[in-house]
Amino acid sequence: MAMTTYGDITPRTAAYVAVELLKRAMPYLCLEKFGQAKSLPGNKTQSMKFRRYNSLGLRTTPLTEGVTPSSEKLTATDITATLYQYGGLVEITDIIVDTHEDPVLQEATAVSSEQAAKTVETLRYNVLKACTNVFYANSVASRGLVAAAISRADQRKIVRALERQEAQHLTSIVKSTPSFNTESILPAYVGITHVDLTSDIRSMDGFTSVADYGKQQAWETEIGACEDVRYLKSTIFTPYEDEGAATSTMLTTSGSKADVYPVMYFGKDAYGLIALKGKYAITPIVINPVPSKSDPLGQRGSVSWKTMQTTIILNDAWMAVYECAATD
């Protein structure tokens, strides 16, 4: 049997499977929304260029009557990121296909989409939590001294630092759909962290629950807002286990030192990424358990996926990582 890029399925079926993969992946992709997102082009390039235009200087000299002022040129900073390929494979036997009461292809697609989304989101998290603009709860000097929960006072320090660096509020995000589109939002910074901090965030002075947003639409996994910041949560953004100070009141893995949770704050264009969206975002491959030279009895098949991905910090000053503990 002739094999295509997609295994034993046609390009049309592959396109359908890809859309299903992306639909199921969307709920896990918090970071997808807020970066400078680019869709993967059809030529499968191994690098992607992100561009940031530089600010113009001030013009404080009065104009002279009848004299055209000198012109300026736009300047930009280009940052090139290398793309890497990732993928996963689920093996299916002929017995499972013949005897399983559930639709095996659909189930394999479901678990593969979850695997793809969590893989991509974890890769992004590992890059972004390494931001050099770091704050510690209660203004301690290092991670090993962290033993306090998130607070509005600390948030205000972070927002002030972002504003001093002219980090702009987010005014648009990438839509939570398989296609590559954006939508406008009310200006805000965003804070993204682990689900363990949900109660502490809700306990912050001035917190507004998503239930009280009124006409403003809440995002998937959004907790609510506190002043300039809207907060989202995910199980993917795991803490540094036992790396905080000794504690008896904060969450801890070992029972002695606090787990330290990164909260990532973002302004506009703080980071760039390849969106898990669009025609070339992900490639599904389905191999049916049919006889072949390598499998004469047709006992083995598979459902797999692969994607080209990258994430890069574009400006450390336009984002921040705040490390805190979680109340037990």
Give the positions of each predicted feature.
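Sequence/fold signature of self-assembling virion shell proteins
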Residues: 2-34, 144-176, 188-192, 196-328
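Short acidic, glycine/tyrosine-flanked loop/strand segments centered on an H-E-D-like triad
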Residues: 73-100, 279, 283-285
